[in-house]
Amino acid sequence: MSEDTISAIATANGIGSIAIIRISGDRALEIASKITHKDNFTPRYASLSNIYDFHGELIDEAIVIYFKAPFSFTAEDVVEIQCHGGFIVAQSILKTTLLHGARLATAGEFSKRAFFNGRIDLSKAEAIAQLIEAKSEDAAKILAQQMKGSLKEYVEKIRDDLIHILAYSEVSIDYAEEDLPEDLVMQIQAKLKELKTSLNKTLQASKAREGLMQGFKVAIIGKPNVGKSSLLNALLNYNRAIVSDIAGTTRDTIEEQVKIGTHLIRIVDTAGIREASDEIERIGIERSLEAINESDIVIALFDASRVADYEDEQILSLIESKAGSKNVLHVKNKIDLEEKFYRSSLEFDIEINSKEGVEELILALENIMNQANTSDEMMLISQRQIGAVQNTLNYIDEAFEPLQEQELEIFSFNLNEAIKEIASITRPFENDEMLDKMFGSFCLGK
């Protein structure tokens, strides 16, 4: 990929026990020899070495490991220097490697070299980047599977099947006087339908399980002053939202994150739903309705101490119409007061101030999220991957009619485009701008 030898600090900035400086390229071993004053490094063996600056002054005592090409992350010669942590030592060693001829790596350049040198495919690169940023055990487990190559195997199987089908068409085009036999057309149609079913299952499962990756979005919905902000604070276990007896205190949506079990949830406290008294409140209520549409789970909160009125009925009807197949938890708050709100369909009774019933509500949320993690279907982890699968499906759909009409050149064109789209999940050779953008989001030492 490049004749440059690059260097960067691979660990996070800050105070710590250990920092790692990574060097990759043809001159990596030469630079390691210059900064250690040692000539012999056995590949993949840790060597305790003194590290010297450009003028021969001792910087630190460190562990130096040499990975000989192609048996390294980048498939180039790589040297990793494990020194004492902190700002000064690591920066001094990095500066010395640059003075000896290395270039400071750009963001994600080590991973980009690994990609272009065939050590990783693009799906694995995406998994690495997202694993570093993972905020829950759910996401980490999914990403670990993708790093092992599960998505790559799936993509290559789909691609190979499409190429196999395309071969029949290409042969018939070469012998233009001959149509595909009817029984072969039926076999191809059946195979394309089978591939469509597989891709649709993957697409649907990925969208349904998006909460495992991004965090499950939970919207708290209800009339003003039923305790939505208090419930948000109780779930977070600290006071995030202002709580007041004045109806309409929350005039906009508030979103916060919290872990429940192995899951990350994004809780949205919404403005109370009622007839708006001013423009600002109207906008807040509109955003509350948007929160229902965008959420994975809805908590519908009602005041047990008040008789159900027209607004309560409206909220129940609204949630039923907007929530669709989403999980909805109906909750009565203020059960310490005389109960006047009678609805047998409400599953949970809570008193937020004493936290009575809150633990049961949290367990119900956890159970819903656990159920989302039971699918064995392949998981797509980015909008780029989802878009590629959707485009593949579109081209397969476009191929059926020309196949039936024996318009084989059009059929072949659509199949070729489908092959390009599915292959782009692991190796999009022709989109340098997209690659630069993706690898540029990595940290410097990755």
UniProtKB/Swiss-Prot annotation:
Pfam families: MMR_HSR1, MnmE_helical, TrmE_N. K(+) binds at residues 225, 244, 246, 249. Its EC number is 3.6.-.-. Mg(2+) binds at residues 229, 250. Keywords: Cytoplasm, GTP-binding, Hydrolase, Magnesium, Metal-binding, Nucleotide-binding, Potassium, tRNA processing. Residues 215-370 form the TrmE-type G domain. The keyword Signal does not apply. One of its GO terms (biological process) is tRNA methylation. SUPFAM superfamilies: P-loop containing nucleoside triphosphate hydrolases (SSF52540). GTP binds at residues 225-230, 244-250, 269-272. InterPro entries: G_TrmE, GTP-bd, GTP-bd_TrmE_N, GTPase_MnmE, MnmE_dom2, MnmE_helical, P-loop_NTPase, Small_GTP-bd. One of its GO terms (cellular component) is cytosol. It is found in: Cytoplasm. The keyword GTP-binding applies. (6S)-5-formyl-5,6,7,8-tetrahydrofolate binds at residues 22, 80, 119, 446. CDD domains: trmE, TrmE_N. GO terms for molecular function: GTP binding; GTPase activity; metal ion binding. Belongs to the TRAFAC class TrmE-Era-EngA-EngB-Septin-like GTPase superfamily. TrmE GTPase family. HAMAP family: GTPase_MnmE. Exhibits a very high intrinsic GTPase hydrolysis rate. Involved in the addition of a carboxymethylaminomethyl (cmnm) group at the wobble position (U34) of certain tRNAs, forming tRNA-cmnm(5)s(2)U34. This is tRNA modification GTPase MnmE.
